């Protein structure tokens, strides 16, 4: 939130003062981790059903999980990421959330 200072004299202009940045305003992300249990086709299916991703996008994320060990699958508020992690756990996937850097 910005604070506006009133002009000191007639004919002078006002100046905005920046408020300090609150680090809790940063976005959160949901990360899916590779696991030895779920089939790649199932992980792709879960991404499509839970997040509404197209098959090519869901496949790209699944391959990132498979090849790199993890992938960011969603971003947003802390509360919405908690919901996403919970849904992924219910689907049997390994997922965590963290504050985006």
Curated annotation (Swiss-Prot):
The lineage of its organism: Bacteria, Bacillati, Actinomycetota, Actinomycetes, Mycobacteriales. This is ATP-dependent Clp protease adapter protein ClpS. InterPro entries: ClpS, ClpS_core, Ribosomal_bL12_C/ClpS-like. Binds to the N-terminal domain of the chaperone ClpA. Pfam families: ClpS. Involved in the modulation of the specificity of the ClpAP-mediated ATP-dependent protein degradation. It comes from the Bacteria. GO terms for biological process: protein catabolic process; proteolysis. Belongs to the ClpS family.
